[in-house]
Design a protein with these regions (language model features):
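Catalytic center-proximal scaffold of phosphoryl-transfer enzymes
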Residues: 1-342
């Protein structure tokens, strides 16, 4: 099967609607939503050759493939395992640019409402990095509590203290105490002390930017550090890697916007346990030939007979047919007939 055929099949792919409401909704105390995105490279935006190059000679050819997944908590993979797995996860993914972002969160809410008794849910935690498209989910789903994910919190703590070497651990503990139990003024005081110890302007700028990030996500960071019992660690970075990046961006690839959206939906469908053969069966078939011409299929013998007749009529120097069906076409015809015959 050629690359062009794969692209055509992917772009025409349609997905089944979400299943109807379950007879009995689950009753759980806490629900968790993790969200992040994958940065996928485009070959073009609207048409080939329309990519712009910035001042740093980098092409502006990135599109966000968004990933949101809902789960009930975590549990060990086996009784004595140190590794954990998500309990009943469900994935949502796609491009969802601009106003379509609301559609993504509406899909998440529809799933929650159809599978859980939301009146009995005490809290819904949203673990994320504070991105704008993620925070907009709070406008579509009431009662969400934002939590800054551990990865980004530790990332900016390390940025603020990496220049302190042996004293870095003590400095990080002081910062965490200020966020957990103090006020913004206490935190800014600690940031000021760190800037005094900075040896270069670059280090001072890094401390200032990291402090500004934590301040912009102040409540979410405070909940992360204070509510350790019910707040679970965020696995969004790992899930983006496994669900999206492994297929779309870990290796050099160029996509179209439609291709990114369809492949992201397909990856979510696969990780939700979707049946690939059933998905193939549900696709629209190509339109049949016009009525009355179904049986007008020329056999090889009739084609050769027609060519001989044409050859005699037009002269011996007329070009004759000398071709056979390729192995690739034979394989495609056999595979297509086999799939639809299941």
């Amino acid at each position: 099967m050629s690359k062009q055929t794969v692209k055509n099949k992917l772009h025409k792919l349609t997905f089944p609607q979400q299943k109807e409401e379950q007879p009995k909704k689950k009753a759980v105390e806490f629900l968790y939503i993790d969200a992040d995105e994958d940065h996928v490279s485009l070959q073009f935006k609207e048409k080939k050759g329309d990519l712009e190059t910035g001042e740093n000679n980098w092409k502006n050819n990135c599109v966000l493939a968004k990933l949101v997944y809902v789960y009930e908590g975590i549990e060990p993979e086996c009784p004595k395992s140190k590794r954990h797995k998500l309990v009943n996860p469900h994935y949502f993914s796609g491009v969802y640019d601009g106003a379509d972002n609301a559609e993504l969160w509406d899909e998440v809410y529809a799933y929650l409402d159809s599978h859980y008794d939301l009146k009995k849910v005490k809290k819904i935690y949203l673990n994320a990095d504070g991105g704008t498209w993620i925070q907009s989910g709070k406008k579509r789903i009431a009662g969400i509590t934002s939590v800054l994910d551990e990865f980004h919190l530790q990332k900016y703590l390390l940025k603020m203290t990496s220049h302190l070497k042996d004293s870095a651990d003590d400095a990080r503990k002081e910062i965490c105490d200020a966020v957990k139990s103090g006020t913004k003024a206490d935190f800014q005081s600690v940031v000021g002390q760190l800037k005094v110890c900075a040896e270069t302007e670059a280090t001072e700028k890094r401390i200032e930017e990291s402090g500004a990030y934590i301040l912009s996500n102040w409540t979410a960071a405070k909940i992360r550090l204070k509510d350790r019992e019910t707040v679970k660690g965020c696995s969004a970075e790992g899930h983006v890697s496994h669900v999206l990046s492994s297929r779309m961006s870990s290796r050099p690839m160029g996509w179209s916007r439609t291709g990114v959206d369809k492949m992201a939906h397909l990856r979510a469908y696969y990780w939700n346990g979707g049946d690939m053969l059933e998905l193939v069966r549900q696709q629209e078939r190509e339109l049949p030939v016009a009525a009355g011409t179904e049986n007008e299929v020329l056999s090889c013998e009739s084609m050769l007979r027609w060519e001989r007749h044409r050859h005699n009529k037009l002269g011996k120097y007329i070009e004759s047919i000398n071709h056979s069906v390729s192995t690739e076409v034979k394989k495609y015809a056999w595979f297509h007939a086999h799939i639809w015959g299941l």
